[in-house]
Amino acid sequence: MLSVAILAAGKGTRMESSIPKVLHKISGKSLLQRVIDSCVELNPDQIFVITGHKSKEVQESIPDNKKIHFVIQEPQSGTGHAIQILCREVKKNEGKLLVLNGDVPLITPETLKNLLNLHDSKNADVSLITTKKKNPHGYGRVFLKGDFIERIVEEKDCNNQERLNLLINAGVYCFNWENLSEIISTLQSNNNQNEIYLTDTVSMLKNALSLEIEDNGELQGINNRIQLSKCEEIIQNSIKEKHMLNGVTFINQASCSISEEAEIGKDVIIEANTHIRGSTKIFNSCVIGPNTFIENSNIGLHCEISNSTVYDSQIMDHIKVGPYSHIRPKSKIYSYSKIGNFVEIKNSQLEEESKVNHLSYIGDSIIGRSTNIGAGTITANFDGQKKHQTKIGKNSSIGANTVLVAPINLGESVTTGAGSVITKDSKDNSLAISRTKQVNIDNWERKKP
């Protein structure tokens, strides 16, 4: 039986934040969720997330999972205290117990599996991950005696000689839970921190083993924004390298960010300062950017999107968007259409070969095939209480600076006069025009201020 305990009770004072440390995000996913995801790959029987500071907020951040249980640690009196509470609350302390911190987002399932395999192969009481650091400041030092761990001394309890030891404790343990439960209650807070250390169990158990791995950044804990930024960079580099090997070109890739869920086709060019978020899918041969933000959207073949934002929408094939366009949620732009500069589209459908080239707002609308929307066109869709729909048939031409007051339905091949305010439906093949007569007053003299 395999159980996992994730320590996530701390406040994270050095983050200088009102957000619990484990809820800070890297590439759109919290530190805690990343640790949970790695642990789920081990197929454990149960996962215990030990919370404390803002416990409700932490618990609500985790999607429902029958295997995940929450244990509250109050007060937060150290890692050993957290496991003392866990052992008291769980009736059956049996099998293996994997313990790790909730702030090690780069830990991989492969490393955790290697630790479990070592533990099983040597029938150990406790096994833990260690690594050698050139600058071990802040980490507990691990002291070996032959093949076994003799003791662990926390940084603040080390003397000058002990601080010279470069082998550090990564804070990832695998225990024989039954043996651990027999000694865990005896731990005391006799140290400079006045906390109960889980590391004290190592010297109390007979068979303590070390899995030493290379210091490749995987074990980096997050205690401040600098470390958070470094982990973000590591993950982003990994994501972008994967896409580049699959045929994607990045122009100034350091300025771009890509979500892990995003799918990007071959021969796509991602220009500078472009950010792809959520479950976005971009098909082959597109040019995205520069200065573009796309979230949870599908972008078809041979599209060009520059200096624009696209949220929760579908852009089909051979479409140009931008510069400075804003495609808002629930919009669908069909193939060979064009969305030009300073255009906002919201909850609307534009069928094939439609064009909205300049300075327009299209909201809650259905625009027919091969329809041209003139510069400055506004769909007035809100009456102060609710939104209304605008429908325009195919092959229509909406004149510049037209206001379409919804609800309204214009037929096929309808033309509207420039500067019109259209409030009534129009039939197929009609001209709709509504404007006051121009009056010219001769010899007009402007009043001077």
UniProtKB/Swiss-Prot annotation:
Its cofactor is Mg(2+). Binds 1 Mg(2+) ion per subunit. One of its GO terms (molecular function) is UDP-N-acetylglucosamine diphosphorylase activity. Its EC number is 2.7.7.23, 2.3.1.157. GO terms for cellular component: carboxysome; cytoplasm; membrane. Homotrimer. In the N-terminal section; belongs to the N-acetylglucosamine-1-phosphate uridyltransferase family. This is Bifunctional protein GlmU. It comes from Prochlorococcus marinus (strain MIT 9312). The gene is glmU.
